[in-house]
Curated annotation (Swiss-Prot):
Site (Transition state stabilizer) location in chain: 182, 243
GO biological process, one term: acetate metabolic process
InterPro entries tied to this protein: Ac/propionate_kinase, Aliphatic_acid_kin_short-chain, Aliphatic_acid_kinase_CS, ATPase_NBD
Annotated binding of substrate, by residue: 91
Protein name (database record): Acetate kinase
Cofactor dependence: Mg(2+); Mn(2+)
Subcellular location: Cytoplasm
Active-site residues, record numbering mapped to chain: 150
Single GO MF descriptor: ATP binding
Chemical reaction(s) catalysed: acetate + ATP = acetyl phosphate + ADP
Origin organism lineage: Bacteria, Pseudomonadati, Pseudomonadota, Gammaproteobacteria, Pasteurellales
Amino acid sequence: MSQKLVLILNCGSSSLKFSILDPQTGEEKLSGLAEAFHLDDARIKWKLHGEKGNADLGAGAAHSEALNFIVNSIFPLDPSLKEDIVAIGHRIVHGGEKFTSSVVITDEVVQGIKDAVQFAPLHNPAHLIGIEEAFKMFPHLKDKNVAVFDTAFHQTMPEEAYLYALPYSLYREHGVRRYGAHGTSHFFVSQQAAERLNVPAEQVNVITCHLGNGASIAAVRHGQCIDTSMGLTPLEGLVMGTRSGDIDPAIVFYLHDNLGLSVEEINTLLTKKSGLLGLTEVTSDCRYAEDNYDKEASAKRALDVFSYRLAKYIGSYMAVIGERLDAIVFTGGIGENSSLVRELTLNHLKLFGYQVDSDKNKAARFGHEGVITADNTPVAMVIPTNEELVIAQDTARLCIA
């Protein structure tokens, strides 16, 4: 009996992540990554029914060549795959204010994604390429393509949370406000937390920490986002792999006036040379800092700044939630796997009663989840994220009868 499967596309400026899921069971049939687009060593790797494969795409290859390879070289390894795909879900980083939920892609939706390019100049153009290529490769599914927006979950933020203290005309005329990111992940783990804590989803109060190379935190009250750390762009907020997060805005002028850096150079410094990379002066990889925390002053410095900033945000979000807090949730590559980051962060929150259970905390990694705080103390927990499943389920909800 044929299945109803969803193809998920996550197009970046130089890469394409793809997967095929059963939206009902969550079973992953195919997953893969095509990367190094526009370079001499463009390549693709995949896992089909547990079997791994890889290939070169050819010098200069990009999204079109990658999708061609998927359809013409990977799909034939299991001919039923293409036949069973009934819809396509696209991860879209920025939807501006226009999109508050996932939508079937129409000409109007495409225009809305184009309008938000100014807020995600690297990501949204790549998403548009992915949509165009999907229309070409799967013409029979043109009305079964769904856009799932990373910004949508944060559209419930109140005005006092999303406005900057800038001339209001900048918001009114140019849309300058806080939008957030990682919304699909924050939504998923908040819902999962509600289920694990036996709290109705519409009543759950959690602080969700999506920690990876990009990192953000969200305050979720009664199942809805009321604040998040990323802003107009994904540069604001927490310390990240190569991004600075929050800084004094006047540092930009200082770098220009005193060091002679151009706007482009400052942008590169803040987005690609800062964060853990800037603090360690070695790497953006949190695993290096964790492994060398007790050996290298730079590694300790990086994780201390990272966890201190995170704890400050958690404390402030406790205030804005303003009532019962059901849990602090850690997710993302660092959140799910770095017991040290979790311990350092929660140690800053002892005033609120948080007490790490060392054994539980160290056991919660590599896909293992659960509560990491001591019994009879406030709950902090690890929940692996699954953005692909959310995209598949939203796509199925809109397209599959």
